């Protein structure tokens, strides 16, 4: 796996239409195996107590985010599909429902990008 700088830009819109734009940077690693792209990094923005190991696995029409640590979950996003996941935190577990509207990616020799648009319900 190659060392990479990871930049995550997120635009979040709540039910009232309020938009918040967030950007996080991390050092991580990238590799491709069996036609799937893997990005690994330590997420320091999910918990004030510890960094959370995070893996992004990208296939043709599916993206999976796997977190294992103080916060743990396995969220899958399937293009034009609905998926469910349990999101475990020290404060309890939430059931998440993701509706994936757009999923695309572009990888070149020295850089890549993933574009994901989804709506989220938390129960």
Set out the residue ranges of the language-model regions.
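N-terminal intrinsically disordered, cationic/polar leader segments
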Residues: 1-122
